[in-house]
């Protein structure tokens, strides 16, 4: 799993929330417009892979698989993607 994808998944734990809106997830890319575009692509990929679910109004939540995938960054034993 690439670093940006790990950062996107880690945002949920960092913010201590079950669901985040796209603007909060953009923080994983910082202030650079290209990096934020890459965050958008990462979010779309995570939804397609079943690691995030869309909640409407640009909100996204981790799925069970997403929590497991995020676990290695948090010291757990999640899968390597």
Where are the predicted features?
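Short amphipathic alpha-helical interface segments
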Residues: 1-31
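Minor-groove-contacting beta-hairpin "wing" of winged helix-turn-helix DNA-binding domains
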Residues: 58-64
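A generic structural-conservation signal
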Residues: 21, 55-56, 79
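Short amphipathic alpha-helical interaction segments
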Residues: 32-48
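Short, amphipathic alpha-helical interaction segments positioned at domain boundaries
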Residues: 67-81
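A short, conserved structural fragment
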Residues: 47-57
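Generic alpha-helical secondary structure signal
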Residues: 3-6, 37, 41, 64, ...
